[in-house]
Amino acid sequence: VTWPAIFNIFAYPVNIRLSRYISEYIVKKLAPRLFAILNCYRNFKFFGYDESKKALPEQFIIISNHQSLLDIPAYMNFFRDKELRFVAKDNLARHIPLVSEMLRAHEHCMIPRKGSPMIAMKVVEDFGKRVIEKQQIPVLFPEGTRTRDGNVGKFYSAGFRKLAETANLPVAACALDGGWQIRDMNNIMRRLKNGSYRIKVVKVFPAPKTKEEQVIILEESRTLIQKQLDEWRKLKSDIR
């Protein structure tokens, strides 16, 4: 897992094509392998509820709660047959092993932390056009930041509305749980022991046509995701 990430750090500045090749290897091979290693050495389980994906169309927008940096490889593992592209803050594109160079090489949507909202919306609009053209699956975390207590925070509408208007795709609301307990990188290996990560599609919405429909999707998705988290937390970490 470590060597491709290190190699990609040096490849990206000098050869974008090579970096994209390495990034593709990281996405398709290392994301599943990462969770297999964690399972083997730390008894850390990954539960992807594959039956929940049966109702998905060919292309769609994913909206999800957000808990840790492991959310990105977790989604890559769950949707390993799809080309995912994430909406993320631009600081993630620097100095994060395994993630940063991959985000840049694969042209994920990097939202500038500094600058006007107009610039940010233009970045999202261009991203929406790009994923449609390339048949990719955009992934958005409407909370805008990682949760501190594991509960679902407020879903902000601006980025989702612009992406929905530009891409005009159905929306898959996905629940994710397990990352909030390891969001702090201190003692991460200890925190991983006997833990679990879960991902499930909780509802697929038709493409919203109005602002009112966009708001309804966000509100209902947040409610359904929190409900799913509450149900999961009644289970032991090793029970599906």
Place the predicted regions along the sequence by residue.
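Anionic-ligand binding region
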Residues: F127
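A short, well-structured juxtamembrane/interface segment
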Residues: R33-F60
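Short glycine-rich anion-binding loops that position phosphate/pyrophosphate groups of nucleotides
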Residues: H66-S68, E143-R146
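A cross-family acyltransferase "interaction/gating" segment
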Residues: L98-S100, E133, I137, R148-E212
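Membrane-interfacial terminal anchoring regions of lipid-handling membrane enzymes
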Residues: V1-K29, E51-L56, R130, G179, ...
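Catalytic core of membrane glycerolipid acyltransferases/transacylases, capturing the structured
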Residues: A5-K29, L56-G115
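Residue-level preference for the first positions of well-ordered beta-strands
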Residues: Q59-I61, Q135-F141
